[in-house]
Amino acid sequence: MRLHHLLLALLFLVLSAGSGFTQGVRNSQSCRRNKGICVPIRCPGSMRQIGTCLGAQVKCCRRK
């Protein structure tokens, strides 16, 4: 029974770490690797923000 609890905790840790993977985009190279483009100010309506490029003003956007 203790093994089940350990495996459940490990599974939770792995799944929670992978869920926000694209939110770590912080430069133009990682933006392109995540199939995004760098756009100044705001993402267009057909795209969503997945991170930033070169600072907070330039957004990394990807199609919805």
From Swiss-Prot:
SUPFAM superfamilies per UniProt: Defensin-like
Q: Where in the cell is it found?
A: Secreted
Q: Which InterPro entries match?
A: Beta/alpha-defensin_C, Defensin_beta-like
BP term (GO), one: cell chemotaxis
Question: What is this protein for, i.e. what is its function?
Answer: Shows a broad spectrum of antibacterial and antifungal activities.
Q: Which family, according to the similarity comment?
A: Belongs to the beta-defensin family. LAP/TAP subfamily.
Q: What is this protein called?
A: Lingual antimicrobial peptide
